[in-house]
């Protein structure tokens, strides 16, 4: 082959090669079609100085004529690629060497990394490509790769790593060190066929103009004896054409390398000369800094694109800035209200070094970022500290949007009424200081003097509740009251109905605090899940007055179903004539109206609670009763005591009642007003503190809780007994079979048939 090359390059016009059919005769030796195909591929892809592409006219003539004269320099390069194969396993090294030679490579085998490094230091070997194993004794493949990339001369040699361990950590480590590809064992033949492309890429990136490549201005030389003849054999026109093709192919290959590291001609090749190497290399690329990365191949290839196409990210960056302004507008409108720390928009806006824009307008957007951040902070702070003008609007808005958890203060809330006793100033001051965290629906907690209620939601002992009892609660007040109230926890028998004065104060009967059943530990608890009786109790100083909100003012009728969207309690059932009827039924109003606000909470569907009652069977006896001056109540089945009904009544929606501490209790009748599903009980405290209504304590939370525990214990004992009996039967059966098996004779581990007498004896023993 060498003689043919020398003769062909000295006298190209006379010395030719005759081709016969698909094979080519070279000095009497025939080349295989596979080698011819590989050489044709090399001729089309290798840069100038190696060969020139064949002319299409000659190809047509070759098809027409069996014998055609082909110039040797028109054919593919004379020299072959020399591959240094580094593999410590002998059999693998021999197999891969044979495959490489079959793919027309020259192979220099090496047993370990030190031997390979000695071969590389010998410049007479002229190694074009290194194919090395990752794990090797003495000097590993990664160590060899580091030595190659740090060497002054050998750093231009492409290094391909191969290993049977294809973990991402190993692959990424090799590629970040400067490897151009990673092959997973077992290696396929088509992967070895495409190894020349790495050499072509390295030569291609270094043979371009200096302005594009940045650092590689000299061409990749293949030091061999035949290189002089090769470089001088092409014509000037061919060289110019190749230069143009090189520039076009350079842009194409750069685009592919930026994406997946393979170009169109690679076929099955999956090259790893990609952005991952650039990202994890110790010296990262940036458009402002020259690319002098000795250990990264793709840095040489990607750098021109980062300079030429640096403006491609401008639309994206501007779009991102526009999106930031839109988010700021949304924040000002209240769509994205932040209670905690605001988002760090600078971290979101930060881009990678490759996506840094050179547009000054984008930098201007960057300077505006802290200002927008502070704007969002102030908006959030103003939203949190914004005083309300109407307390009723505040409460109803919180009730309508229970998902909104903003902190709202009522420091500047106007005084709702002038009818305020002088002795309540201390309560007013303590209530004004309360934040909305203390006045929220989900946490009612009042801090004040001993006469005030300490409302803490005690969520203990929730296991006996149904899934239907935990619903949203709507609280509203009449005529601008602070309107919080209502419902006591289902296991508190001594809880008091809340009363809101017109100046936003919450009070309760002080005597009720002395009656504790020990179920929750606190005398007054608010439960969001249960419904509330509209009950009014007076403070200890004014407890001698009889108050009926329905008889006092017609606009304050109580209703079992309180609409969520309304701010005041509507008269859903009863009109003014019903109020007069209630007054005629024996309500004595002897006190001027200084309490006009009742606590309303949203009542849910009654059939839910009936279903709860039938499932839990928590109240064995249900007594019929209602309180005096009942406005709009239909059939009342729960025993109300001082404005409270048992939480485990038919509806399952009312808080636990008193156990009869306040004097007389008598059943009374109430007009039936056409809504059988709504049941409301108003308990009124008269001058003597007597509670109107039936005072049976059948709905006691402790009794019901104990009943539920008893039911569970009984069911558990029954289950355990059944399991014990079942297991006992299994145990007896197992033991009898075991005893029979031990008695049966065996020969070599196999049972043998017994005689009839022995069988009869075994059966007698079983009996």
Curated annotation (Swiss-Prot):
Q: What is its main location?
A: nucleus
Where is this chain compositionally biased, Polar residues type? 263-272, 343-361, 488-497, 532-543
Question: What PROSITE patterns does the annotation carry?
Answer: CCT, RESPONSE_REGULATORY
Q: Recount the UniProt induction comment for this entry.
A: Expressed with a circadian rhythm showing a broad peak in the middle day.
Biological process terms in GO annotation: cytokinin-activated signaling pathway; phosphorelay signal transduction system; rhythmic process
Q: Where do Acidic residues bias regions lie?
A: 238-252
**Domain spans labelled Response regulatory:** 82-200
| Compositional bias annotation for Gly residues | 689-700
Compartment(s) of residence: Nucleus
Alphabetized, the UniProt keywords read:
Biological rhythms, Nucleus, Transcription, Transcription regulation, Two-component regulatory system
Among SMART domains, the record links this protein to: REC
* Domain CCT intervals: 712-754
Q: Name one GO cellular component term.
A: nucleus
Read off the CDD domains from this record: psREC_PRR
TM segment ranges: none
Which residue ranges does the record annotate as region Disordered? Answer: 1-64, 205-272, 312-388, 476-546, 646-701, 727-767
Q: Where is the composition biased (Low complexity)?
A: 205-214, 518-531
Basic residues bias locations: 727-738
Q: Which Pfam families match?
A: CCT, Response_reg
Job description of the protein:
Controls photoperiodic flowering response. Seems to be one of the component of the circadian clock. Expression of several members of the ARR-like family is controlled by circadian rhythm. The particular coordinated sequential expression of PRR73, PRR37, PRR95, PRR59 and PPR1 result to circadian waves that may be at the basis of the endogenous circadian clock.
The UniProt similarity line reads: Belongs to the ARR-like family.
- Put simply, this protein is called Two-component response regulator-like PRR73
């Amino acid at each position: 082959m060498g003689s043919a090359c020398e003769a062909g390059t000295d006298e190209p016009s006379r010395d030719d090669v005759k081709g016969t059919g698909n094979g080519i005769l070279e000095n009497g030796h025939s080349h295989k079609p596979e080698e011819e195909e590989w050489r044709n591929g090399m001729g089309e892809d290798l840069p100038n100085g190696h060969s020139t592409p064949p002319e299409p006219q000659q190809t047509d003539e070759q098809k027409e004529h069996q014998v055609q004269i082909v110039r040797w320099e028109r054919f593919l390069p004379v020299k072959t690629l020399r591959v240094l194969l580094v593999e410590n396993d002998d059999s693998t090294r021999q197999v891969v060497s044979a495959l490489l030679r079959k793919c027309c490579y020259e192979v220099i085998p090496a047993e370990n990394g030190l031997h390979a490094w000695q071969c590389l230091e010998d410049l007479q070997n002229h190694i074009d490509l290194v194919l090395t194993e990752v794990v090797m004794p003495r000097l590993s493949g990664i160590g060899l790769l580091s030595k190659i990339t740090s060497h002054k001369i050998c750093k231009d040699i492409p290094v391909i790593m191969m290993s049977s361990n294809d973990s991402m950590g190993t692959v990424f480590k090799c590629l970040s060190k400067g490897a151009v590809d990673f092959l997973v064992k077992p290696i396929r033949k088509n992967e070895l066929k495409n190894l020349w492309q790495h050499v072509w890429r390295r030569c291609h990136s270094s043979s371009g103009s200096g302005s594009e490549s940045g650092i590689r201005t000299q061409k990749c030389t293949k030091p061999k004896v035949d290189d002089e003849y090769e470089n001088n054999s092409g014509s000037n026109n061919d060289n110019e054409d190749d230069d143009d093709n090189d520039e076009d192919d350079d842009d194409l290959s750069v685009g592919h390398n930026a994406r997946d590291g393979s170009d169109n001609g690679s076929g099955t090749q999956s090259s790893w000369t990609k952005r991952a190497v650039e990202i994890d290399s110790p010296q990262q690329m940036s458009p402002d800094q020259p690319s002098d990365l000795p250990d990264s191949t793709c840095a040489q290839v990607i750098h021109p694109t980062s300079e030429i196409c640096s403006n491609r990210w401008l639309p994206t960056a501007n779009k991102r800035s526009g999106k930031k302004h839109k988010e700021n507008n949304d924040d000002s409108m209240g769509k994205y209200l932040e209670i905690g720390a605001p988002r760090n928009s600078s971290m979101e806006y930060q881009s990678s070094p490759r996506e840094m824009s050179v547009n000054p307008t984008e930098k201007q957007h960057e300077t505006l970022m802290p200002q927008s951040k502070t704007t969002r902070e102030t908006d959030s702070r103003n939203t949190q500290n914004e005083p309300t003008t109407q307390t009723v609007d505040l409460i109803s808005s919180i009730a309508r949007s229970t998902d909104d958890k903003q902190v709202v203060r009522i420091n500047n809330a106007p005084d709702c009424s002038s009818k305020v006793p002088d002795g309540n100033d201390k309560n007013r001051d303590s209530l004004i200081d309360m934040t909305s965290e203390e006045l929220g629906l989900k946490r009612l907690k009042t801090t004040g003097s001993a006469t005030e209620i300490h409302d803490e939601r005690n969520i203990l002992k929730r296991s006996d509740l149904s899934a239907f009892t935990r619903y949203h609660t709507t609280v509203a007040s009449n005529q601008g009251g602070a309107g919080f109230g209502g419902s006591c926890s289902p296991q508190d028998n001594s809880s008091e109905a809340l009363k809101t004065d017109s100046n936003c104060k919450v009070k309760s009967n002080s005597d009720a605090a002395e009656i504790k059943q020990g179920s929750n530990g606190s005398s007054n608890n608010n439960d969001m899940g249960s419904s509330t009786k509209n009950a009014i109790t007076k403070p200890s100083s004014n407890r001698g007055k009889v108050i009926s909100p329905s008889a006092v003012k017609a606009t304050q009728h109580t209703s079992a179903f309180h609409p969520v969207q309304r701010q005041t309690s509507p008269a859903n059932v009863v009109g003014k004539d019903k109020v007069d009827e209630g007054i005629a039924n024996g309500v004595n109003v002897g006190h001027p109206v200084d309490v006009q606000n009742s606590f309303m909470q949203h009542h849910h569907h009654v059939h839910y609670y009936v279903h709860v009652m039938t499932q839990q069977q928590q109240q064995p006896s249900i007594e019929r009763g209602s309180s005096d001056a009942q406005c709009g109540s239909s059939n009342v089945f729960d025993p109300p005591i001082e404005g409270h009904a048992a939480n485990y009544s038919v509806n399952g929606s009312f808080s636990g009642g008193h156990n009869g501490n306040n004097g007389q209790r008598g059943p009374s009748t109430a007009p039936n007003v056409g809504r059988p599903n709504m049941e409301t009980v108003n308990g009124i405290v008269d001058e003597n503190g007597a509670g109107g209504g039936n005072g049976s304590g059948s709905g006691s939370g402790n009794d019901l809780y104990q009943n539920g525990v008893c039911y569970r214990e009984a069911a558990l004992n029954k289950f355990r007994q059944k399991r014990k009996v079942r297991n006992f039967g299994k145990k007896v059966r197992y033991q009898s079979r075991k005893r029979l098996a031990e008695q049966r004779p065996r020969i070599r581990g196999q049972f043998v048939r017994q005689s009839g007498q022995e069988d009869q004896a075994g059966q007698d023993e079983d009996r």
